[in-house]
Amino acid sequence: MTNMAAKNQFKGSSFTLAQLIEEVGRNGGKKPVFQYKVPRSIRWASTALAVVFLTYGAAYTDMSWRTAREVYGNATEEEKHSPWFKCKTFGPVALGVLPVILAAATKHVTSRLVTEMKYLPPLKNSTVPRCQLTRRTYLLGRPVSITREINELSKNKATKIFTGVGSQGMEDKATFVFFTVDEKAPSFFNKFYIFSRSGSVVKNDARILDCFFNSVAENKLLNRSILTQILSHTSAKTLFHSGNSRSSIKNIVKPK
């Protein structure tokens, strides 16, 4: 057991964090930073659960509608003209929409799982690197991608991506996923993206994900502003000439 645990511990990358980021920048979107293949069991389970909710909703709606019609048919003329009586009799029928909402939510949550993330160089006249997130639609499972600047995607301050546990350094006993927020999402339902902690990270080093999604880095993690400088300059194949930038990069060290 001890040997197995030791094999599964994060031993740290042979790259410094600066080198890791530069490697990502050099790839320029050719290689994914993060990959995850949604297991068939999850896809089938979400579909099965959605079908169960829909079946229950249909059965409940049919039963409550039949019951409401029977009660209304046996009511007196005075009761039939009462708005309160009608609301009380036919109101429960509307609850049949709840299982439909739950079915849609089940498939929607599955469709928010990120299957691939790539780094993209900044656009012309911009110094901010971008990243491309790919997920699959909830009905047909077709890949859909969005591109955002890295400062438009963030995570909750309390969420830890890099934990130092596991072969890639991002295992967590409390959670098996983490969420990122898209600040430019057109609607609330498109605002969140889900990353599985069992996905594959470039060079098996989850520190790179912390760099992309942290607003402020602590200790061995990199500040987003420095990340922007390194990736922008790497994609342009230029060197740092600023004394401040050089001093910042020197502070990027291997994980302790």
Swiss-Prot record:
A Gene Ontology term for the protein's cellular component: mitochondrial inner membrane
Record GO biological process: protein insertion into mitochondrial inner membrane from matrix
Note, other: Present with 1140 molecules/cell in log phase SD medium.
Species, as recorded: Saccharomyces cerevisiae (strain ATCC 204508 / S288c)
GO MF, any single term: mitochondrial ribosome binding
UniProt name for this protein: Uncharacterized protein YNR040W
